[in-house]
A protein has these predicted regions:
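Glycine-centric low-complexity/flexibility signal
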Residues: 47, 52-56, 60-64, 68-78, ...
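N-linked glycosylation sites
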Residues: 37, 75, 89-90, 96, ...
């Protein structure tokens, strides 16, 4: 027994000696005064692997600073003395030595905490938490730092000196359960959180890495970022996700350093980690520093994290970033931007800091109680609203700036309707894309070098898109060298308003399958601008004109239209201006069936044009024949010219329609096969109606509904020329109005198109009709028209032996007694001598007077 006791005592003494020696060596190595950076020796000492911090937040050497490694009991607060500080947390505690922690730490007191310059409080392990809860002030000196997977700090004031930092970059713990922030597979894609991680896979499908999560808590974010994906089975993960930082400051937070929760870098062997979470509550946020939850760089960049600042005032000099990480494998496709939420103003900003990306940041359901104030998408951020039947509503602005894009719906399922409600919708150098129908309700729409693109797919189920702009809508080309501002839809599109609609820049346009502009007091189409419906392709035009080309019928909704203004598939027009006080056209209005209804005045300036030329029927009632190698022209107001080729004749299309009240489209011609192509007749322009005539039309520019000419030379298999197609017939211009002024050499035409080589016949002319609504005869005669320009209803020319198309018609409403002609001019002799008994034309009256 005695031998056994001696053996135990000997081993106990030996063990104690070994332990004391080990501790002595450790203390010497940690306090030797040699230069010691944040990561030197710590990986082995704490059993930690992976980068401690991101590249942008390297910890500086803590030379000449005492360091120690500490472990404290869980759920118990530590004292100032435990951290080898001077003072107390209930008065003022000064920390003068760096501490490496192996576990969570909790600091509590009613006093102040000051971490002196070059001193750090470090727990560089995934998910480790440092909590500071003091009633007084906290100050970080120059180059001082707090580093941990989670940092929670509560104080009356927090001052961060120059180059100091609170950092949880690349130290995130596990993200919430049932989330897909870490990508699946070995593609080296980035992790997701506030924004999706980037994927560098190249195929025809839309790809991304890790997905977003924690959307519902973006105003109070408290989730870790996610790891990036690896590129092999040996390395399954890339960079770590960012950690969490929560700062609860009763008064002022001064940041002259940085607060970061960035994703870790994955290098070329893995994707970048996604950014973590930063939450700040303070009355005043000041300084010149950085607050960042950016994604990490990797083969595919990590998505940005989430930042929420609940502060009464925020100094603009602060740099707040949640951009995605750079992608080494696909430099043009970084990670998607995260979210920055201003909880005091209730505004959301998604900015990618001009880092280019093809990866989207999904925004899910929006708050309805309370409503957010503003949403900003900017600096190359791409935002996706993926949920069907989504409503995005804010109290203030929705702004998309500087290369930003806002996408509603999914391209494979353009079946839903999306709503956007705000005071203002502001776009500058940006894009809004909609897959489905789009309903907008704003007071002001301003677009600079931007576009709204609406894709309703090929389904007729999608309803019309409606943009209600109550006060002001302006499309402007701000920089001539950049793109133009365009609103386009391949389905029905309506713009309603109570104020002003302006297209001011060269190339600015509003285009749709059908387009209705209504209720504005003024619509201005500036020089080089365009209003167009239908679109340029034949299918779009055919869907609008088909019901008027197959049978000869007059669209009653153009002659006696409904009082209200709406757009649907049952109405005949393709482009409607409805209940607009004044229309000024310096650019181009272009459509198959243009209807200007319940307007007061229309002014077409010198460079302006309203045209339905070459937008009528491909075939039609007066279709030109192609027979025996020769093509006859199409007919309408006049018969189409016959085509001749090698002595063989092809009769032109027949005349049709009513000269007194014309309401038909011009007809076209088609060849024997697709190689010939086709020729299209003129469309139709209707201004006013029987019940609501136009007050005045001032035409300084041009008003056209001409047929298309055929200029293509057709060759046979041996290279010899064959007969060409005839020209299309002119369309219709029908004007219900009180006064017409054709000034400064304007041009009003419904001419037929020319026949093509060889021997094509010309198209017949169209029809022009003036339906005068009120002719002043009470006290003195007031002319209804001032004509100094040109009206042309001629048929198109035939090629070679091809015949010209016949002339169309120009008619006016029957005049009162004493007036004659198309423009109801005064017949003076008739008026004074025979107005009570006769209403003949002047020549007849003059002849009767001479005989008498």
């Amino acid at each position: 027994m005695e031998v056994v006791m001696q053996f135990v005592v000997m081993h106990w003494n030996l063990w104690c000696c070994i332990l004391l020696g080990y501790l002595q060596i450790s203390c010497i190595s940690l306090s030797s005064g040699h230069h010691l950076n944040r990561s030197t020796g710590l990986e082995n000492w704490l059993g930690y692997s992976g980068s401690l911090v991101g590249d942008d937040s390297l910890l500086y050497d803590s030379a000449f600073v005492e360091t120690s490694t500490s472990s404290f009991p869980l759920n118990e607060s530590v004292s100032c003395e435990d951290l080898e500080g001077v003072g107390s947390f209930n008065t003022t505690c000064l920390l003068s030595s760096t501490h490496y922690l192996k576990s969570d730490i909790y600091i509590y007191g009613v006093g102040n905490l000051e971490i002196l310059s070059d001193v750090s409080l470090l727990c560089p392990m995934e998910g480790c938490m440092i909590t500071v809860n003091v009633s007084g002030n906290v100050k970080l000196g120059q180059d001082a730092s707090i580093v941990s997977g989670s940092v929670v700090l509560s104080a009356a004031n927090l001052t961060m000196g120059y180059n100091s930092y609170i950092d949880s970059s690349s130290l995130g713990g596990s993200p919430p359960s049932q989330t897909s922030g870490t990508p699946v597979g070995n593609d080296g894609a980035g992790g997701g959180h506030g924004g999706r991680g980037a994927s560098c896979l190249k195929n025809n499908k839309t790809n991304w890495g890790g997905d977003v999560y924690a959307w519902s808590t973006l105003s109070e974010p408290w989730s870790y970022g996610s790891k990036g994906g690896g590129k092999s089975t040996k390395k399954q993960y890339g960079g770590n996700g960012g950690g969490r930082v929560k700062l609860l400051v009763k008064d002022t937070l001064y940041v002259n350093g940085s607060i970061t929760a960035k994703g870790g870098d994955g290098g070329s062997d893995g994707g970048g980690g996604s950014g973590g979470s930063i939450l700040v509550h303070a009355v005043k946020l000041k300084g010149y520093g950085i607050i960042s939850a950016a994604g990490g760089t990797g083969w595919g960049g990590g998505g940005g994290g989430r930042i929420s600042l609940d502060c009464y005032s925020i100094q603009e000099d602060l740099n707040i970033t949640v951009h995605g990480g750079l992608s080494i494998g696909c430099p043009g496709n970084s990670g998607a931007a995260g979210t920055y939420f201003n909880a005091h103003l209730l505004s959301l900003k998604v900015s990618n800091d001009n880092v280019t990306t093809e990866t989207e940041t999904p925004l899910l359901d929006f708050s309805t109680s309370p409503l957010w104030s503003n949403v900003y998408v900017e600096n190359n951020a791409k935002v996706l609203v993926p949920l069907v039947w989504s409503r995005v509503q804010v109290r203030g602005q929705i702004s998309v700036y500087s290369g930003g894009s806002l996408i509603f719906g999914l391209s494979d399922y353009p079946i839903s309707e999306f709503e956007l409600v705000a005071e203002e919708l502001l776009l500058s150098d940006s894009i809004i894309k909609v897959f489905g129908a789009f309903r907008v309700s704003v007071k002001m729409l301003l677009m600079w070098d931007s576009s709204i693109q609406i894709d309703g797919g090929e389904s007729t189920v999608v309803t019309a898109s409606v943009l209600e702009v109550r006060n002001l809508a302006v499309l402007r080309d701000f920089l001539p060298s950049q793109q133009n501002s365009v609103i386009s839809s391949n389905t029905n599109l309506a713009l309603y308003g109570q104020g002003l609609l302006q297209l001011t820049g060269d190339g600015d346009a509003i285009k749709g399958q059908r387009l209705s502009l209504s209720l504005f007091y003024n619509v201005t189409v500036g020089p080089g601008s365009l209003l167009q419906a239908p679109l340029d392709d034949d299918a779009s035009r055919g869907s609008v004109t088909k019901h008027l080309c197959d049978t000869q019928r007059c669209p009653i909704d153009l002659i006696t239209p409904p009082d209200d203004c709406h757009v649907n598939y049952t109405l005949s027009f393709s482009l409607q201006i409805c209940r607009v006080e004044d229309l000024l056209v310096n650019g181009i209005m272009k459509g198959s069936i243009i209807h200007i209804h319940r307007a007061r005045t229309v002014i077409v300036d010198t460079d302006g044009m309203i045209t339905a030329s070459e937008l009528g029927c491909t075939e039609g009632i007066g279709k030109g024949n192609f027979l025996n190698g020769a093509g006859g022209g199409a007919g309408h107001g006049g018969k189409g010219g016959s085509g001749y080729f090698n002595g063989r004749e092809s009769i032109g299309g027949s005349e049709y329609g009513n000269a007194i009240l014309p309401c038909e489209l011009g007809s076209g011609t088609e060849g024997p096969n697709e190689s010939y192509g086709h020729v299209v007749g003129g469309g139709m322009i209707v201004m006013g109606s029987i019940q609501w005539p136009l007050l005045r039309l001032d035409l300084y520019g041009s008003l056209r509904a001409d047929g298309e000419s055929f200029s293509k030379s057709i060759k046979s298999s041996d290279g010899s020329s064959v007969g060409g197609l005839g020209g299309g017939s002119g369309g219709t211009v029908l004007l219900f109005l009180q006064e017409l002024r054709l000034l400064e050499n304007p041009y009003l035409s419904v001419v037929g198109g020319n026949g093509g080589p060889v021997g094509g016949g010309g198209g017949g002319g169209g029809r022009i009709h003036f339906h005068w609504s009120k002719i002043g005869m009470e006290e003195e005669y007031v002319p209804v028209a001032s004509i100094t320009g040109t009206m042309n209803n001629s048929g198109g020319a035939g090629d070679n032996d091809g015949r010209h198309g016949q002339e169309g018609t120009i008619t006016g409403k029957a005049c009162p007694k004493g007036l004659y002609g198309i423009f109801c001019e005064v017949c003076f002799i008739c008026f004074f001598l025979f107005s009570s008994s006769y209403s003949w034309i002047c020549s007849e009256c003059w002849r009767y007077a001479v005989i008498s």
